[in-house]
Amino acid sequence: MDNIRRVGEIYQCPVMITEVGFEVDESRPEVLAEGKRQLLRVLRESKSETNGICRGVFYLEPECRPSQYRLGAFTEDVHPTIIMEAFSEMR
């Protein structure tokens, strides 16, 4: 989060983290769990370690199928994976 703070301070503006994504492999639940853990870490750190400079986190293409883009957050039959739970856990 040092870079987020640095960019905000240099340009005197709020910053967003854009285009995050984590691997979706429906056959490996541990991969999905790790994606959720990492997204939750990014969300928490962006809120607690940026002195209010970070205004949000944008997940790139969460609804795409893994066969189209491996870093989405939905299953092949277009249902959300546990990765998306990270957003609701931040409320």
Where are these regions (language model features)?
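A cross-family glycoside hydrolase active-site/sugar-binding cleft signature
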Residues: 16-21, 58-60
